[in-house]
Structure formats: C-alpha cells, structure tokens
Amino acid sequence: MNSLEQAEDLKAFERRLTEYVSCLQPTTGRWRMLLIVVSVCTATGAWNWLIDPETQKVSFFTSLWNHPFFTISCITLIGLFFAGIHKRVVAPSIIAARCRTVLAEYNMSCDDTGKLILKPRPHVQ
C-alpha cells in the first residue's frame, strides 16, 4: 500500500470518527440536561424533606409518603442510573478513550472530537 492510499485511509477513518462523535453530542447533551434537572429536583426535595420538623416525629416510610416530590424524584434518579445514564452522559469520551488505546499501537492518538493526532515515529538506534 503506498503512502497516498494510507493517507486516504487515515482521512476516511478520521472523517468517520469525527462524524460518529459529533452525532453523539446532541444525545449526550439531552441526557446531561435530564440528569441535571432530576438531580436538582432530588436535592431540592431532599432539602425540604430534611428541614421539615415532622420528618423526625414520624416513621421513615410515612415521612417519604408526606414528601412525594422527593420520593418520586429520588426513584427517578435511581431508575436513570439503573438505565445507564452515567454511561450515556460520557459516551463521546468513552469512544475517544477506546480509540486512543487502539491508536497508541500505531503511534497515533485522537482528541475528544475525533481528530487524529499523528505522533513521530520512535527512532531505533
């Protein structure tokens, strides 16, 4: 394979990688916004639950029943983590890290957007 074909292959690989990473960005942004909203709701509900004087006087389950906003938001947050939201919010970083691992064998790397970084060849003496 001559160097022109190799360069074309590298360019095609880089285009495909940047395309894939950029296609993940909108979805990742939506998952991040959902996680932020549910986290803020859970924190707000937890604050209201903790400062309520009735919380100390009643049983735990009665206290949760008296604070449905906190209960629902907490269950939603737990459900999101079981559904894998912690992986979805960092999906482009995971893809880039895995590509870096593979590309390291070929003296290459890539940034978080998928652009290839060519490293100089090691000099053998």
Curated annotation (Swiss-Prot):
GO process terms (BP): lipid metabolic process; positive regulation of triglyceride biosynthetic process
Residue spans crossing the bilayer: 33-53, 65-85
Family: Belongs to the CNEP1R1 family.
Gene Ontology, cellular component aspect: cytoplasm; Nem1-Spo7 phosphatase complex; nuclear membrane
Function of the molecule: May form with the serine/threonine protein phosphatase ctdnep1 an active complex dephosphorylating and activating lipins. Lipins are phosphatidate phosphatases that catalyze the conversion of phosphatidic acid to diacylglycerol and control the metabolism of fatty acids at different levels. May indirectly modulate the lipid composition of nuclear and/or endoplasmic reticulum membranes and be required for proper nuclear membrane morphology and/or dynamics. May also indirectly regulate the production of lipid droplets and triacylglycerol.
The gene coding this protein: cnep1r1
Species for this entry: Xenopus laevis (African clawed frog)
Localization terms from the record: Nucleus membrane; Cytoplasm
This protein's name: Nuclear envelope phosphatase-regulatory subunit 1
Entry-linked PANTHER family: NUCLEAR ENVELOPE PHOSPHATASE-REGULATORY SUBUNIT 1 (PTHR20996:SF1)
Domain of life: Eukaryota
Keywords from the named record: Cytoplasm, Lipid metabolism, Membrane, Nucleus, Transmembrane, Transmembrane helix
The keyword Repeat is annotated on this UniProt entry: no
Membrane topology, record value: Multi-pass membrane protein
